[in-house]
Every structure is written in C-alpha cells, then in structure tokens.
Regions:
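Small-residue-rich helix-interface/hinge motifs
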Residues: 2-139
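Short, membrane-interfacial amphipathic segments enriched in basic
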Residues: 142-151
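Pore domain of cation channels
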Residues: 156-165
Length: 165
C-alpha cells in the first residue's frame, strides 16, 4: 500500500513539474508535441488529442511515429552523420497533409496528452528542443517560429526552469 502512495505522490510532483515547462512553452508560443505522465515505450494506456475542436481518445494504443522522415542523398540513400546515425528532417506541410485524416501527426498544433504504462516520471516533448541525443549542427532546417530553438535565450531559460517554479 505504501508503494502506491509513493507512486501517487511522485506522479503528482512530476505532473506539476512538467506543467511548469508546458505553461512557459505555451506562453512563448512554442509547440508542445506531447505531455505524458509515466513513460510509454511501444504503447500508451491512454492517449488524447483535441482535433478540430473535438477530443479524440485512444486506449491501449501504440505510439505515433514522430513527424520526421529520413534525410536522403541524391541516390535515395539515407544520409548518416559521422557516427553512422541516420539524419532526419521534419515533414513538409505537403507530406503532413498527405497523411490519412485519422493520423494525429496531421494536426501538429495541438498537444497529445497521455498516460504511459511505466510508472517512472513523465515528459513534455517540446518542438525544436535539442537534447543530448541530438546534435544541433546536423539539423537540416532553419528553426521555425514555433520551435524552442528559435526563441531568445531568456525565453528558453524560462521554459527550462519553468519546471521548478
């Protein structure tokens, strides 16, 4: 019983922490792609997204692939960085509009909310945030106005420290 109380208490703290990042990102008009309580490898217990004014909810649904496609060379082969990792680029507006109507990636302006199934932590996926798994020099496109990396230093700082406020 005490482990349930611990998980509940930590979950509340994580949600409040991630809401801090979320709120500051939205204040500065940065897209937040996902907001999750708990981690969700492979699938999520609950996923929800507001599309055209209506909430769509899915239970026990597999995760949506990121809106990224491999960067190709002139021969049609995947480009790789110096470490041999594939390079990706964001989907173009035309590629996004070509997705089926039911594909949530077609609606990048709204946040996907969810509950994962691994009860450790949570996350807030902010558009254009370059983390330790990415190299900013390998990003092929110019920063978009709604991306984290396009914001002033003080705005990025507010978004980062928003989790502790």
């Amino acid at each position: 019983m005490q482990w349930l109380q611990l998980i509940l208490a930590l979950s509340i703290l994580v949600v409040i922490h991630e809401l801090g990042h979320f709120c500051f990102a939205r204040i500065f008009k940065v897209r937040v792609e996902k907001f999750y309580m708990f981690f969700n490898p492979k699938f999520s217990l609950v996923r929800a997204k507001k599309i055209n004014g209506k909430w769509q909810i899915k239970f026990f649904a597999s995760n949506v692939e990121p809106s990224m496609v491999p960067l190709l060379d002139a021969m049609g082969n995947e480009k790789k960085d110096e470490k041999g990792q594939p390079l990706y680029r964001p989907m173009t507006d035309e590629e996004i509009q070509a997705l089926p109507q039911e594909d949530w990636r077609r609606y990048p302006d709204s946040t996907e909310w969810g509950i994962g199934w691994v009860p450790f932590g949570g996350y807030c996926a902010i558009a254009g945030m370059v983390d330790e798994t990415k190299d900013a020099t390998n990003l092929p496109s110019e920063p978009q106005p709604w991306e984290f990396r396009s914001k002033n230093v003080w705005q990025r700082l507010c978004i980062i420290i928003g989790g502790i406020l």
